[in-house]
């Protein structure tokens, strides 16, 4: 997350539903897991459990907190969706650390495992569950802050399985693996590139073979006349056809990626959300794209909704202005 964003506390969340056997009188039917740090980065990161059952008497109240052991941390990313194993991967970006929480008792999660660098890969960012239940993760660097990281695959419990470097040896391309989009129908993984340390801008996405982790393509985003919106490909989402991906840049451009099973996949610029602000994590709900937008320079703060029935020609259908004091950063679907 950029230091310039108005939002000062990073919090990432996942919604989960309790199973029928867990639900007893006075216990919530839905919970919100929040991964966060204190505003001064002095105390340990912790997972908070919040009552998210709107019909409960204690709706919105804190149920429990489960801290980690390290301090001066930066609670950052978790998976967008709760993995089928019920294990939550959560990173502390500053400390280059991963924590795994076990949620078999939804009201009382437990910290089951943690680890730092893996095979020299450091600064983990995103996690996503593969169709076989394993977890794939982006690591921004390998061996030092000025190096290129890659992909690392784990079992659901966090055992290292294999890895693949993102670096392009043939030419100098600035890469820092960031977001993940899975395309199981076409056996593809898409990774975006944004440097959390903000040493340089990135302009490329990468395409991988899901079964082998072979790096297939490294593609630069097309430039757009009179607009600087091709910087830092940030987050992507798979569309309902199971083949097309939309992804936005931190500089608020929206791009379509298709022909993923062809020799030359195609990237097309399709929309510009706003001038100046930063565009962060979106949600796709059916044929709607819901985009967070934040600005520290007096620009638009809020959420923009696009109709993406025709992804090559999205249409804005609504926007919510959250005011100058609140810049949105993260959205997560309730699944």
What is each residue range found by the language model?
Residues 34, 90, 137-138, 191, ...:
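Residue position within the beta-strands of beta-propeller blades
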Residues 180-304:
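Beta-propeller domains
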Residues 69-83, 118-131, 169-187, 223-244, ...:
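Beta-rich, blade/repeat-based domains predominating
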Residues 38-41, 94-97, 141-145, 195-199, ...:
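Short glycine/acidic-enriched loop and turn motifs that connect beta-strands
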Residues 59-129:
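Blade-loop segments of beta-propeller domains
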Residues 106-184, 193-195:
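Asp-box/WD-like beta-propeller blade repeats and closely related beta-sheet repeat scaffolds
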Residues 49-58, 100-109, 157-159, 207-216, ...:
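Short loop/turn segments immediately following beta-strands, especially the blade-tip
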Residues 58-68, 110-117, 161-168, 215-222, ...:
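Beta-propeller fold detector
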């Amino acid at each position: 997350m950029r230091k310039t964003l108005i939002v000062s506390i990073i919090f990432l969340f996942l919604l989960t539903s309790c199973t029928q056997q867990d639900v007893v009188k006075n216990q919530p039917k839905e919970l919100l897991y929040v991964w966060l740090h204190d505003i001064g980065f002095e105390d340990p990161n912790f997972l908070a459990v919040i009552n998210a059952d709107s019909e409960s008497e204690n709706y919105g109240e804190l149920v429990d907190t489960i801290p980690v052991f390290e301090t001066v941390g930066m609670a950052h990313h978790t998976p967008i969706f709760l993995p089928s194993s019920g294990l939550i991967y959560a990173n502390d970006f500053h400390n280059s650390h991963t924590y795994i929480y076990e949620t078999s008792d939804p009201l009382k999660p437990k910290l089951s495992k943690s680890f730092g660098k893996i095979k020299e890969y450091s600064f983990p960012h995103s996690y996503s569950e593969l169709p076989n239940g394993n977890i794939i993760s982006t690591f921004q660097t390998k061996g030092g802050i000025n190096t290129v990281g890659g992909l690392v695959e784990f079992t659901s419990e966090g055992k290292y399985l294999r890895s693949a470097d993102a670096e392009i040896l043939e030419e100098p391309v600035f890469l820092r693996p960031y977001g993940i989009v899975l395309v199981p129908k076409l056996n593809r993984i898409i990774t975006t590139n944004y440097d959390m340390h903000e040493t340089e801008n990135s302009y490329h996405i990468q395409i991988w073979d899901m079964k082998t982790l072979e790096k297939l393509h490294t593609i630069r985003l097309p430039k757009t006349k009179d607009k600087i919106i091709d910087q830092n490909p940030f987050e992507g989402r798979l569309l309902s056809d199971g083949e097309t991906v939309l992804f936005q840049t931190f500089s608020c451009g929206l791009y379509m990626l298709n022909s993923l099973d062809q020799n030359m996949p195609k990237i097309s610029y399709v929309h510009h959300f706003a001038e100046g602000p930063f565009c962060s994590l979106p949600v796709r709900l059916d044929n709607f794209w819901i985009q967070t937008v934040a600005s520290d320079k007096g620009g638009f703060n809020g959420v923009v909704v696009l109709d993406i029935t025709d992804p090559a020609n999205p249409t804005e259908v609504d926007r919510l202005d959250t005011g100058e004091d609140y810049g949105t950063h993260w959205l997560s679907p309730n699944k």
